[in-house]
Amino acid sequence: MAQATERFRRYLDDELGECRDEDVEQRLDELGTLEAALGTGRVDAELDVLSALANETRYTIVRVLVAAREELCVCELHAVVDVTESGLSHALSALVEAGLVDGRKDGRWKKYRATNRAVALVTVLEGSVSDD
């Protein structure tokens, strides 16, 4: 930590022309406020969502549901992803838990749709990758 603090002090010295202990304390307080504003619970929740997408099967399911713009039956999703029924069920459970898909029973069929959160994330991701 001492090495990091010294480097931080050198950075402030370069930025301010002269760095005093008060400058270091003030900037550390400002950075602490930024960190506190994030909130541990919020960061954990966001990481849970990203973790749910960090699997090819789950991400493919989300992409298909977003592209479909309608509910799809589990049997339709199973035709798209190359996993066992158990694997599909596990993936869908993780996506429901992360708030990326909603499921409902329709008679003897289980149907799923993408949530607004899933649509927003896929939209952002599509815009972050170029086709080049």
Please tell me what each predicted stretch does.
Residues 1-52, 100:
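N-terminal leader segment of winged-helix/HTH proteins
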Residues 40-84, 110-112:
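N-terminal helix-turn-helix DNA-binding core of bacterial DNA-binding proteins
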Residues 69-70, 96, 126:
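Residue-level detector of secondary-structure transition/capping positions
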Residues 79, 96-97:
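Alpha-helical residues within the helix-turn-helix
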Residues 92-93:
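Short, hydrophobic-biased segments on the C-terminal half of alpha helices
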Residues 97-106, 113:
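Beta-hairpin "wing" of winged helix-turn-helix
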Residues 111-132:
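Conserved segment of winged-helix/HTH DNA-binding domains
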